[in-house]
UniProtKB/Swiss-Prot annotation:
This is Chalcone--flavanone isomerase B. The keyword GTP-binding does not apply. It comes from Petunia hybrida. The lineage of its organism: Eukaryota, Viridiplantae, Streptophyta, Embryophyta, Tracheophyta. The keyword Isomerase applies. GO terms for biological process: flavonoid biosynthetic process.
Length: 220
């Protein structure tokens, strides 16, 4: 990483997201944009299910800075366009979802699919191709079991492919378990995490704070 993209690790609950990673199916080293938990209210109590780290290719800073440099973390966290620019930007992204509580692949994949479809219907972008991508995703993930500490990894190419990988510990494999060639679905997975109705407001806050500082110190 260049000095202009100097980043630190982030700890969420008992899990540490390192400052840089080399994702599966990628030749590049990505930096940690931010990380946070994802939880739900269960019978009146907030329960944390996963922790999520979002990594970006270094060129993301060069792409985003001209528009967003000078904005505070508070301004970025409330900007739908800022997170949309991250989701759709022409650079590689990598998302690691680590499980705090055990979930079956069926439970996890059906919730992701539900959120993606809701996003597409809300934006009028639901398509047959997107629906087929979701079916493939459900088939890839449904037989998995995610115990505490396990992860599902998403490597998102700017060309549109989504590489899905699984790991039971801190490791990251070089190759993925499956590839889905559908840009709409690839973007929707990240959109439903950090977009306008994203499931992890904590990750959004972390990204806004860290990226605001990176822009401030960037040469772009």
């Amino acid at each position: 990483m260049s000095p202009s993209v100097s980043v630190t690790k982030v700890q969420v609950e008992n899990y540490v997201f390192p400052p840089t990673v080399k994702p599966p199916a990628s030749t590049k080293t990505l930096f940690l944009g931010g990380a946070g938990h994802r939880g739900l209210d269960v019978e009146g109590k907030f329960v944390k299910f996963t922790v999520i780290g979002v990594y970006l290719e270094e060129s993301a800073v060069q792409f985003l800075a001209p528009k967003w440099k000078g904005k505070s973390a508070e301004e970025l966290i409330h900007s739908v366009d800022f997170f949309r620019d991250i989701v759709t930007g022409p650079f590689e992204k990598f998302t690691r979802v680590r499980f705090i509580l055990p979930l079956t692949g069926k439970q996890f994949s059906e919730k992701v699919a539900e959120n993606c479809v809701a996003h597409w219907k809300a934006t009028g972008t639901y398509s047959d191709a997107g629906s087929r991508a979701i079916e493939k995703f459900l088939n890839v993930v449904k037989s998995e079991t995610f115990l505490p500490g396990a992860s599902i990894l998403f490597t998102q190419s700017p060309l549109g492919s989504l590489t899905i990988s699984f790991t039971k510990d801190d490791s990251i494999s070089e190759a993925g378990n499956a590839v889905i060639e559908n840009k709409q679905f690839s973007e929707a997975v990240l959109e439903t995490i950090i977009g306008e109705h994203g499931v992890s407001p904590a990750a959004k806050c972390s990204i806004a704070a860290r990226m605001s500082e990176l822009f401030k110190n960037s040469l772009f």
